Amino acid sequence: MNALSIVNKVVTLVSYNMHKTRLNAVTACVKSLLNGSAATVTSIGRGINAKAFEKHRIKRADRLLSNPHLVSETPLIYASICQLFCGNTTRPVISIDWSDLDDRKAHFLLRAAISLKGRPVTLYQEVHCNKTKEKPATHKAFLKTLHAMLPSNCRPIIVTDAGYKSPWFRAVRALGWDIIGRIRKPHLYSLDRGDTWQCIRYLYTQATCRPKRFDNSQIVRSNPFACTLVLFKQKSKGRHASNPDGTRKASKRSKAH
């Protein structure tokens, strides 16, 4: 099945209550993006496959993206997507992460995506500014909305990166879900039910490509959080941060010496 057939099928399934004219406009804009158009009003409009003049195609995309009815239907569309991709499984693996939306670092995307055969499919996402980015209240509201959209029998496994800390873990566990995350310094950990605490970096030297499991562990000495720690070091993939011109990034301190 080619991409256009999949788009037609999925869009129809998740927007069955949408007005036909608006549904056709959504499908046309999605196909425009699928054919390589940038995610801007002008580019989407120019990429619409229709006999209308270019200015009318751009106006069509502009009307759709500013349509208040489409905005009000967005939660229902996300809920339908959750039902479509999570309805047949009770333990989906859902990745949640932040990403930048623009080069100015002014807008950020918080996205929940299900992993299907190595491909992420977005279930729900929100756009935030610097004032609400990575705030506990933002995370709790996001989880509450996602919980309401998922099927009632769904108990997902949430996967997050090292940027999320114990308040996030507690919020996920409060919903009855399981979570997999990365712990990095300066977190403190205990392997003996709180009798001895050490910085997590002391475990780094023991890490190998063979996973080690530590049951009945705790993190955060001031407010212990019970968990299972797994120590694992993956083989280096040779990735390096790059500057906009493609050269390898270097710290100011290394340049001074």
Locations of the language-model features?
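Single, function-defining residue in the core of a domain
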Residues: 1-38, 46, 50, 57, ...
